Amino acid sequence: MPFVLFIIGRARGYYMAPAYPVLFAAGAVWGERWVASLSSRRALVIRRTTWIALAIGALVDAAIVLPIAPPGSSWWRFADKARGGDFNEEIGWPELVQTIASIRDSLPVQERSRLGILAAGSGQAGAINLYGPALGLPKAICGMNSHWLRGYGDPPPETVIVVGMTRDFAQSAFESCQIAGHVSNRFGIENSTIRNTDIFVCHSLRQPWPRFWQGFQYYG
């Protein structure tokens, strides 16, 4: 029943992945008994047909699931659409973090010591937390989902690199903001890495951090 509900709700297939072996095993028991009831000739045809279908299915799945299509190609776009847009979200994250690191390096030394990186979404925050340590970046500050529970650090940052936010948000949240860079990817593929492409360096949060943080929690 959960499997049927997931199909009806068009949920992501891998959420049910731990249940697939159980479902396959249950089907295999029934299938084995059914094939055993057939004549040897029919059983042989069924077995060969099954193996051929599995081989074709494996090739099709590999073409769609594995990252082997050239990014931006027709094949890639078809696979991306079949996967619900997951492929395009794999593009550009290292470049994003490298751009943030370059902006950090351009700041005065005294500003780097109390630096924070405010990310709009869990994608940006995850990329910063994954690739950032090798570049000496601090952990991302993010209000989305469970990232909000991790807070903004102690002591709170004084200089903030704002990623993925609109200019209106940056200017309303901070007293001073300047565009310091832009987000892009070498394939020109539009995804959440290049949504709100400006990266800002901001100073002087207009509210105390605890008050700002209480109103900054959101879900997505």
Residue spans for each PLM region:
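Hydrophobic/aromatic-rich transmembrane helices and adjacent perimembrane loops
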Residues: 4-48
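Membrane-proximal, lumen/periplasm-facing interface regions of secretory-pathway glyco-
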Residues: 44-113, 123-126, 130-138, 143-146, ...
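Short active-site oxyanion
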Residues: 112-117, 158-160
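Short, flexible loop segments at boundaries between secondary-structure elements
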Residues: 146-156
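Short, well-ordered secondary-structure micro-motifs within conserved domains or adaptor modules
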Residues: 154-166
